């Protein structure tokens, strides 16, 4: 049965025709292209890279950026795309988030004209894939403590250090790498195949299995001055990228929660126990479903208001953190309740609930720590 949406408070009435059309496009892509293959991808720990060109054609990559072939969507439209992609699987949403918010955004915001012209059209179309190298083995929630270094050597820079838990790392044509120099924290575009730059994929994950996660290593990796983003100086630059990513996660979590709720609702209607009655006829089950839809509705309204503020240029980083913190925690609770309602069936991959539950676990701290969002 095709997904019709979860809207118990007429939230759709707050969306424009253009926003509804964008959501329908993303919803159709999720239904027709992602869902038929995502269970096998999750089983096989494989990212469906065959979908990348189509996501580029649909304008999903760098969707809310302008120029260089980007779709120029509003931030609400971009959020709706994130919602629908995560409803299918977080691995697909994460790919799009990293490509747009963590690679294309810093190039767009801090890059030179030559860097923008060279990379943005290729990244937008999916002809090139990027990754974001910030997290280190000893510094995850505290990026200010990074040990990766950039040392000027004539007209070049020499990079040394390690990055880990890097989405898209093993498939990336270019890495957006952050390192400490005498001038402060700087950003560099390091291409695949650069001497001294190596990548190893992280295996054995219980979560985000339909996503590539890697470690990056830099050993006297020499890049030219043209690889440095001239407008990126200090920790504020990478932190601004994280705010872009958190915004997308906040919307995506709503999609995962919707899928868990709808799965539990349909299951509880079809599942009959105790004299042949649907388990949905019991008040205990009804209370759980009512709690889920109430929390989803609040999360929808929070995401929509955040999107409106962002489109007006008024959304603050702390507000983005609140959006992401609230909505991911809500989605995790919905996934756990849904798994409970499905009983033993909840742990099988015949249903998407356990996949969402596993995927949402690292989304709670990522990027950069659940407990750190509101600390001074």
Predicted features and spans:
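A short core secondary-structure module
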Residues: 156, 160-200
């Amino acid at each position: 049965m095709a997904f019709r949406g979860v809207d118990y408070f007429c939230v759709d009435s707050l969306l424009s025709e253009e926003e509804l059309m964008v959501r329908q496009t993303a919803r159709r892509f999720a239904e027709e292209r992602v869902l038929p293959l995502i269970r096998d991808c999750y089983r096989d720990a494989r990212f469906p890279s065959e979908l990348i060109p189509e996501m580029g054609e649909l304008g999903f990559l760098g969707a809310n950026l302008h120029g260089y072939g980007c779709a120029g969507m509003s931030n609400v439209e971009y959020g709706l795309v994130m919602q629908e992609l995560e409803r299918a699987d977080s691995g697909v949403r994460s790919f799009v988030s990293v490509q747009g918010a963590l690679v294309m955004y810093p190039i767009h915001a801090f890059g030179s004209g030559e860097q923008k012209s060279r990379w943005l059209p290729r990244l937008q179309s999916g002809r090139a894939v990027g990754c974001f190298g910030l997290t280190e083995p000893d510094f995850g929630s505290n990026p200010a403590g990074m040990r990766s270094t950039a040392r000027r050597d004539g007209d070049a820079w020499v990079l040394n250090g390690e990055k880990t838990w890097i989405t898209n790392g093993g498939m990336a044509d270019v890495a957006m790498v952050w390192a400490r120099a005498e001038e402060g924290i700087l950003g560099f575009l390091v291409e695949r195949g650069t001497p001294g730059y190596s990548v190893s994929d992280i295996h054995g994950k219980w979560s985000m299995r339909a996503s590539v996660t890697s470690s990056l290593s830099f050993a006297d990796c020499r890049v030219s001055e043209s690889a440095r983003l001239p407008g990126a100086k200090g920790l504020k630059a990478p932190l601004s990228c994280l705010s872009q990513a958190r915004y997308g996660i906040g919307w995506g979590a709503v999609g995962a929660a919707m899928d868990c709720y709808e799965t539990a609702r349909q299951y509880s209607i079809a599942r009959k126990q105790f004299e042949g009655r649907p388990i949905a006829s019991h008040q205990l089950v009804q209370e759980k479903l009512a709690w889920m839809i109430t929390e989803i509705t609040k999360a929808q309204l929070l995401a929509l208001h955040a999107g409106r503020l962002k489109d007006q240029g008024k959304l603050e980083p702390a507000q983005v953190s609140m959006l992401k913190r609230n909505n991911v925690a809500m989605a995790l609770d919905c996934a756990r309740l849904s798994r409970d309602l499905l009983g033993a069936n909840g742990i099988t991959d015949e249903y998407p609930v356990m996949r969402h539950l596993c995927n949402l676990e690292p989304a709670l701290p990522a990027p950069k720590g659940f407990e750190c969002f509101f600390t001074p």
